[in-house]
């Protein structure tokens, strides 16, 4: 079933609440003060049922200028607008402001409702119709149906219901296959149940028992119960008005303007890159550095406007800007927003979010402006490639990319496939992606680093893997760093052996004297067999004048894996170590576990020597220790 939210808009006392009551039978004025004053102060909600069994949620917003902030909180999630204009008064200031807000928020469909038609004669109605047509010309309601009604007499109510039903059928259904997001417009407590939040589910689907994250705080909770239009449900989907009972959350932990979202699906930031537009009929110019009220979803925050390519934004103009906040904001690329002047409060413009967690930009930076142009107007592939490039070596998943771009994964998948096919992106790990340009830059740094290392350490077979990861990557998990380096190994650019990396064309070049020392050292360790020799004793066998040179060659043999370090200054010939591994493999063919005593007997050596070798096997994951026993390690059969 399709789920759509209809929102009222219009000047105070033009009959929005009475119209909703006539349509739905629900009085959305629930506060005593609203009853006493005869005007809507808070958001009201009702369910509108249609003959075919479908239904829509109706959000009734206040029309008084003092409550525009509340109106904005309700307007953020609507699909269809119901612009209400009283026939006896016509367009008024808040009618204009509400229409501007709907346009800025990206609402593209709706109906114009002329109310209180019983209070206007035929001549006045004709004037009202003409004025209405002129006022909506050039807006999204220019060709919208106009329905004349009277809540008092019932005139036009059925026509309006049929018109709304037709619009609902034509409205595109929102996807439930994306992470859910619910801007919170109301918070209260229910005895015996705890904290309940309400809002319009603008994306995805929520499930009872599912995990949810409160933003911008990042507090995690569990969905204890869900209600849609007062009825319990196991699942709620985008386009529905939802009440969510949250487990372990206090009422004081949540405020209107917070967002409830699928964990890790929405980023928080104090910077937003945007396309900012100033209303044509605004009397204000937005200066660089202006302080404004930023209205997004159900939230309102103070922001500083940094215009990126000019000093001022005049009425009717549009430009790229960065909004800077003093508190965290939870938003996504593609979201719409409204800005209101700081003092006096009036709507002056709005726009669309292009980057929801950017870096702090300098003004008049051509590269920044070019990147924003791609984000706004580029093809799907261009936007994906730009996002991958910006994410550097983070290796995002498709879901993370989709969330960053405000794009559904089903739309993202073919764009990613095309980039992979053209060689503009790569997948170092299954389901993890990187831009090829980032890989090229990474290789340039890696090559320069290793070239320098080889020059300074000509007798070392390579740099330790851990050291290379530390020097080459920042805040990248070892598994992902190794996957990127493995790409270079696969491409024949790097060589990896004995936990060390080297340039593929690098070889250790010994002098004649060093070659002789190497031969002698290897012969000594080979003769020692399973009796690990201390390096100081080995070095004592050589002429004192060759001591420094011998130490360098010894270090080279260790880095090259020709000698295996069992402990500080205790080494074993690699052939002996390989032989020990083979004996262990053969032993495990007939036994489940290995003891130190059995290993000693297997090698035919002393207990101390056997223990040193066995601990080395543990470190290299050839064996796995469980108390006093050993079992086959992950790398035993490599």
Give, region by region, the residue ranges found by the protein language model.
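Residue-level signature of catalytic and energy-coupling elements of molecular machines
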Residues: 13, 19, 38, 60, ...
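Conserved nucleotide-binding/hydrolysis micro-motifs of P-loop NTPases
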Residues: 64-65, 88-92, 107, 116-121, ...
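Conserved catalytic-core segments of large NTP-driven translation/proteostasis enzymes
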Residues: 117, 134-282
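Conserved Switch II/interswitch segment of TRAFAC-class P-loop GTPases
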Residues: 55, 61-66, 76-127
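Residue-level recognition of beta-strand microenvironments
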Residues: 11, 187, 204, 226, ...
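C-terminal effector modules of nucleic-acid-centric enzymes and ribosome-associated factors
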Residues: 120-124, 131-134, 249-565, 573-622, ...
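Conserved catalytic network of the ASCE P-loop NTPase/AAA+ motor domain
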Residues: 12, 39-41, 47-52, 73-77, ...
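Conserved G1/Walker A P-loop phosphate-binding module
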Residues: 1-61, 65
């Amino acid at each position: 079933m399709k789920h759509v939210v209809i929102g009222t808009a219009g000047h105070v006392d033009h009959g929005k609440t009475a119209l909703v009551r006539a349509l739905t039978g629900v009085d959305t004025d629930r506060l005593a003060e609203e009853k006493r004053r005869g005007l809507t102060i808070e958001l009201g909600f009702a369910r509108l049922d249609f003959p075919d069994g479908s239904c829509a949620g109706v959000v009734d917003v206040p029309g008084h200028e003092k409550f525009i902030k509340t109106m904005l909180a309700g307007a953020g999630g609507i699909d269809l607008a119901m612009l209400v204009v009283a026939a006896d008064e016509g367009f008024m200031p808040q009618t204009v402001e509400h229409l501007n807000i709907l346009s800025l928020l990206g609402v593209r469909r709706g109906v114009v409702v002329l109310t209180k038609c019983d209070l206007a004669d035929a001549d006045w109605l004709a004037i009202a119709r003409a004025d209405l047509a002129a006022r909506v010309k050039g807006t999204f309601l220019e060709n919208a149906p106009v329905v004349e009604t009277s809540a008092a007499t019932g005139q036009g109510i059925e026509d309006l219901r049929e018109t709304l039903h037709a619009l609902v059928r034509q409205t595109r259904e929102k996807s439930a296959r994306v992470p859910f997001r619910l801007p919170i417009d109301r918070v209260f407590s229910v005895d015996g149940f705890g904290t309940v939040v309400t809002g319009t589910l603008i994306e995805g689907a929520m499930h009872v028992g599912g995990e949810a994250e409160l933003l911008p705080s990042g507090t995690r909770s569990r969905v204890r119960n869900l209600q849609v239009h007062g009825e319990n449900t196991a699942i709620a989907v985008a386009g529905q008005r939802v009440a969510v009972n949250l487990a372990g959350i206090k009422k004081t932990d949540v405020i209107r303007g917070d967002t409830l979202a699928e964990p890790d699906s929405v980023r928080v930031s104090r910077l937003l890159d945007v396309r900012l537009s100033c209303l044509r009929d605004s009397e204000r110019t937005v200066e660089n550095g202006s302080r404004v009220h930023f209205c997004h979803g159900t939230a309102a925050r103070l922001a500083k406007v940094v215009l990126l390519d000019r000093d001022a934004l005049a009425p009717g103009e549009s430009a790229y800007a960065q909004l800077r906040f003093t508190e965290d904001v939870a938003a996504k690329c593609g979201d719409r927003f409204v800005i209101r002047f700081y003092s006096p409060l009036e709507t002056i413009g709005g726009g669309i979010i292009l980057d929801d967690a950017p870096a702090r930009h300098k003004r008049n930076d051509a590269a920044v402006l070019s990147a924003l142009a791609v984000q706004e107007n580029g093809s799907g592939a261009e936007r994906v490639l730009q996002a991958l490039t910006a994410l550097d070596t983070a290796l995002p998943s498709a879901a993370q990319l989709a969330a960053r771009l405000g794009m559904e994964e089903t739309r993202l998948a073919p764009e990613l496939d095309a980039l992979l096919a053209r060689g503009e992106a790569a997948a170092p790990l299954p389901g993890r992606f990187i831009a090829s340009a980032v890989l090229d830059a990474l290789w340039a740094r890696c090559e320069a680093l290793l070239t320098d290392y080889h020059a300074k350490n000509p007798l070392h077979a390579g740099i330790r893997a851990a050291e290379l990861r530390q020097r080459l990557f920042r805040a990248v998990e070892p598994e992902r760093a190794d996957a990127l380096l493995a790409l270079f190994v696969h491409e024949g650019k790097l060589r990896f052996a004995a936990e060390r990396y080297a340039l593929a064309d690098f070889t250790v070049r010994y002098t004649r004297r060093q070659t002789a020392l190497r031969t002698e050292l290897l012969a000594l360790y080979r003769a020692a067999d399973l009796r690990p020799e201390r390096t100081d004793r080995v070095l004592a066998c050589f002429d004192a004048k060759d001591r420094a040179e011998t130490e360098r060659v010894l270090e080279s043999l260790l880095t090259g894996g020709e000698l295996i370090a069992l402990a500080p200054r205790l080494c074993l010939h690699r052939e002996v170590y390989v032989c020990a591994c083979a004996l262990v493999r053969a032993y495990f063919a007939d036994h489940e576990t290995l003891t130190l005593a059995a290993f000693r007997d297997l090698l035919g050596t002393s207990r101390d020597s056997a223990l040193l070798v066995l601990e080395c096997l543990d470190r290299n994951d050839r064996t796995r220790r469980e108390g006093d026993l050993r079992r086959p390690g992950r790398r035993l059969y490599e």
